[in-house]
């Protein structure tokens, strides 16, 4: 990621655009398929709607519910990240502010709608309550359930329904790869630019503020790459299970945003 990112903002923009399209595609699939399942099942939800009580045992108290705020804020994390690219925007004094407002509205509606739509195909106790489900694979578990539920709603055979779920998971894997790749390219440059180039140069060693021929702080980006690699290695060999490892990585990403 760093090797390509140091070659300039144009490289980052092209890859990020592909990632954005992948995310939009996944959300569109969720919307259309959930709507189809809801119609085929006569408006029946796999997880009954309850706006006051969470099916997750970990969110039964008011204090526990407050911990969800971290994830709610993370939904807007990308907006903060692209703030470092405001100078790359055409007519930023007008277009950037407008883009932030539109993005915030879309995220708010989309985030809330997606939570409700997952209840169409996934029941907490049957799908998400398993010990094997964690923050690292939950998207694939949900999409597999979405595909399998669609097959059942279409009265396909159990084998065909399961195969539909498998293909949904495979397509999700490709889409998530593209989405995360785009996010990593943006996050490898934008926050670093805001920290280093947004503060007095006297605070940093000259090598950290030096730009390469593409206008990128290459030395700082490579140092960042090294530090991230070290932290990942330290966490991965901490002795916890893979599930706990994925949970830690996700929580680290949320806090960092």
Where are these regions (language model features)?
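Transmembrane helix-loop boundary segments of multi-pass membrane transporters
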Residues: 1, 10-20, 171, 180, ...
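Hydrophobic core segments of alpha-helical transmembrane domains in multi-pass membrane transport
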Residues: 2-5, 24-35, 224-234, 257
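Hydrophobic alpha-helical transmembrane segments of multi-pass membrane proteins
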Residues: 2-3, 65-73, 171-185, 249-252
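Structural signal for the C-terminal ends of transmembrane alpha-helices
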Residues: 4-9, 86-87
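Membrane-helix boundary/coupling elements in multi-pass transport proteins
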Residues: 81-85, 163-206
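Transmembrane-helix boundary/entry motifs in multi-pass membrane transporters
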Residues: 1, 22, 153-173, 201, ...
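Helix-loop-helix junctions that connect adjacent transmembrane segments
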Residues: 17-164, 169-170
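Loop-to-transmembrane helix boundary motifs in multi-pass membrane proteins
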Residues: 90-93, 102-107, 181-185, 196-239
């Amino acid at each position: 990621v760093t090797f390509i990112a140091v070659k300039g903002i144009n490289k980052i923009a092209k890859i990020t655009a592909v990632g954005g399209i992948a995310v939009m595609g996944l959300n569109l699939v969720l919307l259309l398929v959930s709507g189809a399942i809801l119609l085929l099942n006569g408006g029946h939800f796999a997880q009954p709607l309850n706006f006051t009580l969470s099916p997750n045992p970990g969110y039964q108290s008011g204090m526990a519910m407050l911990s969800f705020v971290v994830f709610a804020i993370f939904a807007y994390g990308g907006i903060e990240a692209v703030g470092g690219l405001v100078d790359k925007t055409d007519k930023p004094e007008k277009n950037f502010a407008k883009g932030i407002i539109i993005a915030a509205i879309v995220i708010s509606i989309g985030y809330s709608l997606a939570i409700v739509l997952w209840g169409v195909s996934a029941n907490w106790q049957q799908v998400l309550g398993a010990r094997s489900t964690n923050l690292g694979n939950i998207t694939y578990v949900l999409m597999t359930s979405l595909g399998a539920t669609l097959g059942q709603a279409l009265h396909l055979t159990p084998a065909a329904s399961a195969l539909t779920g498998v293909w949904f998971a495979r397509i999700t894997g490709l889409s998530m790869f593209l989405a995360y790749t785009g996010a990593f390219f943006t996050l490898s440059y934008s926050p670093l630019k805001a920290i280093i180039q947004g503060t007095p140069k006297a605070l940093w060693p000259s090598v950290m503020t030096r730009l390469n021929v593409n206008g990128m702080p290459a030395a700082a980006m490579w140092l960042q790459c090294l530090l991230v690699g070290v932290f990942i290695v330290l966490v991965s060999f901490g002795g916890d299970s893979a599930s706990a490892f994925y949970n830690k990585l996700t929580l680290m990403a949320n806090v960092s945003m």
